Amino acid sequence: MKISIVIPVFNENESLPDLKVELDKNLSAYPEWEVIFIDDGSSDGSTEYLADLCAQDSHYKLIQFYRNYGKSAALSEGFKLADGDYIITMDADLQDDPAE
């Protein structure tokens, strides 16, 4: 069973390190998982943080928009790339608890 988590991101650079810690902690119990970040035209360093993360850990993938298309467009692109048996969406600002 593979889990895909699709997360749209727009200017969430401050939240991303904490989000990664929580995702790693909660997903480590599963043998197969991926996290797909869709950067929706961020200008605060989110794109660079996510690119570095994806280069270091193959569980993480990045789709980059060069301007803000909105949450629906971001989710749609994430769904196209997701190949898990289960697909979960969440926000990058930690309003959704990764443990849930």
Where are these regions (language model features)?
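Structured catalytic core of nucleotide-sugar glycosyltransferases
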Residues: 1-100
